[in-house]
Amino acid sequence: MYAVIKTGGKQYKVAAGEKIKVEQIAADVGQEIVIDQVLAVGEGSAIKVGTPLVSGATVTVTVLSHGRHDKVRIFKMRRRKHYQKRQGHRQNFTELQIGAIVG
């Protein structure tokens, strides 16, 4: 069984037992969270697609860890104008373990 969930402004296709990295969620490590923004649920060839959400469908996840992605370097330059600007960014993430999918 799999589901398509929405969290942090992005959509993820998940199945029970998988680990995913999502945008940072304000929760403690080891805490269980119920995600109710389920866009689709499927098993085999049968699929339920929500409009926009599947009513009554939930995905239970456990917070494994919090961390930061690798640094992304931004470099801006204007040719012939002696203008250069360097900037770096590291995005925070939360690693989740997918538990039960109900729907």
Curated annotation (Swiss-Prot):
Gene source species: Polaromonas sp. (strain JS666 / ATCC BAA-500)
Keyword RNA-binding: yes
Quaternary structure, from the entry: Part of the 50S ribosomal subunit. Contacts protein L20.
Domain of life, per lineage: Bacteria
InterPro entries xref list: bL21-like, bL21-like_sf, Ribosomal_bL21, Ribosomal_bL21_CS
Single GO biological process annotation from the record: translation
PROSITE patterns, alphabetized: RIBOSOMAL_L21
Gene name for this UniProt entry: rplU
GO CC aspect terms: cytoplasm; ribonucleoprotein complex; ribosome
Role according to the record: This protein binds to 23S rRNA in the presence of protein L20.
Protein name, entry field: Large ribosomal subunit protein bL21
Family, as annotated: Belongs to the bacterial ribosomal protein bL21 family.
UniProt KW keywords: Ribonucleoprotein, Ribosomal protein, RNA-binding, rRNA-binding
Gene Ontology terms, MF aspect: rRNA binding; structural constituent of ribosome
Pfam families: Ribosomal_L21p (PF00829)
UniProt-listed PANTHER family: 50S RIBOSOMAL PROTEIN L21, LARGE RIBOSOMAL SUBUNIT PROTEIN BL21M
